């Protein structure tokens, strides 16, 4: 499996953990979020999240389509072009994925994959023209998440009920492999942004030992402390440099939710 640093960062940003607190109805139709990914003042990439306005249906299961797109910008798009697209069709009643699609274009590398989740049977059917064999079945738990559904499990919970030091974890299926991610609640802080000062919940993400991140507290994620509970800001201390991800725009059904300061 080939997973770029950018792909891993997007994975971490939008799939963090499953929580145990009061649940919320958060799978909103017509939602659009845009993020800026930058090294200091240099824009490196952007990421967009879009949810369909209307429900669809797969195998007679009602679903809402969610799409995440990440792409490089400027000089990064010249020397290391990347366009990654993830799509998830989620059951609104359970927030479990019914079908997930991935399309990676990273330099000369290409990867397409489709995963059909059968939670009642404990099976994920994975199909990719780049895999050998092309089709395979993978045994999964009946609550296995994909990249995008994990993001909504996070937003579904009342994060303000959490205590500092509380730890959580989850397993997700991405690119044919299961990842486990841990999260530690670090505190409640005010974050300065283009939208003014925002109350946020700060967390730290912990991964198994790897050669990408500088230290155990290298990934810091701030989640908005409001009814929307969206990833508001992220800072990553890589061995190759310091990277930031900031919210640029947030709309629901075309209506601006956070207004930028003049």
Task: List each language-model region with its residue ranges.
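Hydrophobic, well-structured mid-protein blocks that either form specific transmembrane helices
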Residues: 113-155
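Bacterial Sec-dependent N-terminal signal peptides
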Residues: 1-24
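Acidic, serine/threonine-rich low-complexity disordered tracts
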Residues: 22-119, 158-262
